[in-house]
Amino acid sequence: MAAILPRPRSLDASALYSRINARLLPFLLICYLFAYLDRVNVGFAKLQMQTDLGFSDAAYGVGAGIFFIGYVLFELPSNLLLPKIGARKTFGRILVLWGITSACMLFVRSVPAFYAMRFLLGVFEAGFAPGMIFYLSRWYGPSRMARAIAMVFLAGPIGGIVGGPVSAAIMSTLAGKAGLAGWQWMFLVEGLPCIVLGIATFLYLPDRPADAAWLSDDEKRQIEADVGAPEAHATSFRSVLRDRKVYVLAFAYFCIIASIYAISFWLPAILKAQGVSSLITLGWYTSIPYVAAAVGMLYMGRRSDRLGERRFHCAVPAAAAALLFALCAATGNHLAPTLALLTLVTMALWMAYTVFWAIPPEYIKGPAAAGGIALINTIGLSGGFWGPAAIGWIKTAAGSLQPALLAMAGVSLVGALLIFSVRLASAKH
């Protein structure tokens, strides 16, 4: 067992982590921002694409969610290879391939083609989010992890803030140019930057602190001391597969993700049904919930780190989201209360999401961390298929969104109860 190196007392830890934050977090945030945009811009494309191609609500909901089937199937292989291949090559490969696939969405003309392209997008993006968690766990100890996660995954709300107005502007101003519809231009313009980011990742990102030329040897030792020796509570991937608490976490995450992506994919359509007809106005309205989510994420991540508590900081927002979903279903077709409640729902869910991802790296240590985190994400992220698809199915069957919103209230409540039920310490298998 390798010894934990003593922390160099002369170093200013605050200054060191300020440098690490400045070097890594903005770049990772930008990468995840485009990942999020390429996942959910299909929700905005729906406003034109569904009419142009004649897709039903159910078919569109399945197509939006089928991304996650591809993601789930290839999640574990991608992350089990991550420690061997390295973050730089893994993230670079993911970015380039999903950028190409996202841009090629402009060629979709039928439901089967729509399903196929969304599936491939999931295959090529597989492993990115849990890979980020594993990568951050090599740089940040428990006392800083939730804030680092909040800073990177702030890309989700930022994507919601800028995604609506930017997508609306592209679809409105470029429609008809070069014979392409507005939704085709949107996929092209938002997909190509990922290819550039993938190349930049190969050149810029260090795989781990030991590979960072901009850190001194003392600084590298301090990071290792802060993170802790991975062998101290090492877990094998086989033991992770037998751990009941890992599956409780995974299904709790399933509920959070199903709720988040149900809102992400259907928010533009929900607001349009309330009478918002202008694409530009709709784009700005859809950004409002994500402004609140960004503030909530930063607040909850900082508070959770400061108090050293995860379970209640994750479960309470999820329970609040359940109540808010139910209230939203009761508002009927009224724009102002619907938008206000969906804003609070979005904020609560992203707060739960942020703190949730500080939990697995504290529980699963050592060589199995990448695979264990991927297992949780694999099971949980399948909620990204079922959430949007369920909204589409229920809306088609009931002729109304209200029963679908009540269903999501139930899903969020189950997630909160699962988080409440599990007590975790570092795994020692």
Each model region followed by its residue ranges:
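Extracytoplasmic gate region of multi-pass secondary transporters
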Residues: 42-43, 240-298, 353, 357, ...
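Helix-breaking motifs and short loop linkers at transmembrane-helix boundaries and internal kinks
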Residues: 54, 86, 107-113, 124, ...
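Conserved MFS/SLC helix-loop-helix module at the cytosolic interface between two early adjacent transmembrane helices
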Residues: 73-112
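Helix-to-loop junctions at the C-terminal end of transmembrane segments
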Residues: 74-86, 296-309, 395
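Cytoplasmic membrane-interface "Motif A"-like loop-to-helix N-cap segments
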Residues: 83-95, 305-318
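Cytoplasmic helix-loop-helix junction between adjacent transmembrane helices
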Residues: 117-154
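Glycine-rich segments within core transmembrane alpha-helices of 12-TM secondary carriers
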Residues: 147-171, 193-194, 377-387
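C-terminal transmembrane helical hairpin of 12-TM major facilitator-type secondary transporters
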Residues: 310-359
